[in-house]
Regions:
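Cysteine-cluster motifs in flexible loop/terminal segments that predominantly coordinate metals
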Residues: 40-70
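N-terminal pre-domain segments of enzymes
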Residues: 94-152
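Short beta-strand element of the alpha/beta-hydrolase
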Residues: 197-198, 208-217
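Cap/lid segment of the alpha/beta-hydrolase catalytic domain
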Residues: 214-328, 371, 375-377
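Mobile cap/lid helix-loop segments that gate and shape the active-site cleft of serine hydrolases
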Residues: 292-295, 364-415, 440-461
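Alpha/beta-hydrolase fold nucleophile elbow
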Residues: 331-343
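C-terminal catalytic histidine-bearing segment of alpha/beta-hydrolase fold enzymes
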Residues: 399, 444-504
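Conserved strand-to-loop "acid loop" that flanks and positions the catalytic carboxylate
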Residues: 420-437, 481-483
Length: 504
């Protein structure tokens, strides 16, 4: 009897340890979930930003940087132990495997074989643009089923309240020619409600301006120094400037204004709209209970439904609900909507643009793995790495390709192709090896046959251009900016040049 009691105690202790490790991994996954640098995890060489690319060989090999102490939303503090221990003790518990170190050897990365973007499920090639609508649906179903997850089919009521409508304040001065509007967008279903704060800047002298729409990482107040922009009440990562216990404070204002050069955008006649991505779905793994997932509890992802939506699909779905508002908003050209995103939100912009044809131009900035970069190159961030660090971003089916990218019968060039014939712009950064700039370029190149099918020019080259030398005179554009994983004025300048060239 004594030995049975001993075994029971040992098993109970082991179970307790496993539960604690899984909980620790859940909290640990949240460490990368903000846009402190918005790189998924570290790992790429030559970076100067925390969470971007590792600054030492050991950090690069491990694929993440270590922060000794982290303040989390429940006010508990956890010491972060070495990634080696986490991968061995936790990664194996969660997924039954360790994550391989990142590859930066181009001779290894070039060993892959892609299918044609014009090939159907049986390998047959479509030959005319009349066949394109059905083929595009096949591609979107493929990505929904195997990577991003299907959004629910149920409808929501979209209700809008104007919170503020006046002149914008930029650089500390009231701007007479700039109109700033703040709208509370309520998504309502079955007695539940989600609020999204939409901030819209538009030139006062243009009756209908084409509009860039993109989500931000830290709240609308972080995108400018305008003191009248409402402080976000949604979850924020406590490591970001001006955030205390996962809530933004006044000190967070303008903390990412360099990513939103509002004056320069408006000077060129464009409007720009943004919302905090956490308004749509807070960026941590809670089993899909909060945000817009909570509006559809019957559509929650689980082991029995591995192809239901993850957070990227939820953010993309939210962008479409914001498009519902913008296409009816005074001063905005409903035929001039353009979706833009950086990093994980670049992935989001691609998925939103692929599904919603109201976005006439789609822009991906440093979107990397699960975005514009080819997964089968396994260069920089891998499928296993991203699924382990951020299990809530994609659907469960995508995990079966962890360290098995060679078994994928699809890749991101087909996602780019699904946007055709609408123009798409892909931007990379020279130091952002983690996001695989060449893999991003090659997706555009291999998507080009879908554009040629529509009589449009794609991206012909398979070689990276010189830094700060944009390429692509047709419907697919690309540039490699000098520098790190970021979204800067130079990037926006190229986006606007490309937009104008394509009729926006």
């Amino acid at each position: 009897m004594q030995w049975l009691i001993t075994i029971a105690i040992v098993l109970a202790a082991f179970g307790f340890v496993v539960v604690k490790l899984r909980r620790f991994w859940f909290e640990f996954s949240r460490l990368g979930s903000s846009d402190l640098s918005d790189q998924e995890v570290s790992g790429g060489p030559k970076s100067s930003c925390y969470g971007c690319s590792g600054s030492s060989a050991s950090e690069s090999d491990l694929g993440i940087r270590i922060k000794p102490l982290v303040q989390l939303g429940d006010k508990r503090k956890h010491s972060v132990v070495s990634m080696c221990f986490l991968q061995a003790a936790v990664g194996g518990v969660v997924y039954g495997q360790e994550v391989r170190p990142p590859n930066y050897d181009e001779t290894i990365a070039s060993n892959y074989k892609l299918g044609s973007v014009l090939a159907g499920p049986q390998g047959q090639l479509i030959e005319s643009k009349d066949q394109w609508p059905a083929h595009r649906k096949y591609l979107l179903d493929l990505f929904a089923d195997q990577e991003y997850g299907y959004a629910p089919q149920g409808s929501v009521e979209v209700r809008t309240e104007v919170i503020d409508d006046g002149q914008g304040v930029l650089g500390g001065e009231v701007q007479a020619g700039i109109r700033r509007r703040q709208l509370a967008v309520f998504l309502e279903r079955n007695g539940k409600q989600v609020r999204i704060d939409l901030l819209v800047w538009s030139p006062s002298d243009r009756p209908k301006a084409p509009c860039f729409l993109g989500l931000n990482f830290r709240g609308n107040q972080s995108t400018s120094d305008d003191p009248k922009v409402r402080l976000t009440s949604s979850w924020c990562d406590s490591r970001n400037p001006g955030v205390v216990e996962n809530r933004a404070t006044e000190a967070s204002r303008a903390s990412q204004s360099e990513r939103w050069p509002i004056e320069e955008i408006l000077e060129r006649g464009y409007a720009v709209a943004t919302a905090h991505y956490s308004d749509i779905d807070p960026d941590y793994d809670d089993g899909f209970e909060n945000g817009v997932h909570g509006l559809f509890p019957e559509h929650r992802s689980d082991a029995e439904h591995p192809n239901r939506w993850g957070s990227i699909a939820a953010w993309a779905w939210g962008l479409s609900r914001l498009a519902d508002v913008l296409e009816k908003l005074e001063g905005i050209d409903p035929k001039g909507l353009m979706v833009v995103g950086h990093s994980r939100l670049g992935k989001t912009a691609l998925w939103a643009g692929a599904n919603d044809e109201r976005f006439g131009l789609v822009i991906s900035n440093n979107s990397g793995c699960g975005g514009a970069a080819l997964s089968q190159r396994v260069y920089g961030e891998s499928v296993a790495r991203i699924n382990t660090s951020f299990p809530h971003w994609f659907n469960r089916n995508f995990r079966k390709y962890n360290d098995r990218e060679d078994q994928m019968h699809f890749d991101q060039h087909q996602l780019i192709a699904s946007i055709a014939p609408r123009p798409v712009y892909i931007a990379s950064a020279s130091n952002d090896k983690w996001a695989d700039p060449l893999g991003e370029l090659l997706s555009g190149h291999h998507a080009s046959s879908a554009y040629r099918l529509h009589g449009k020019q794609g991206l012909e080259t398979q070689e990276l251009p010189a830094v700060n030398t944009p390429i692509g005179d047709g419907a697919i554009g690309y540039h490699l900016r000098q520098g790190d994983h970021d979204l800067l004025l130079y990037d926006w300048e190229q986006f606007m040049i490309f937009a104008k060239r394509n009729g926006f």
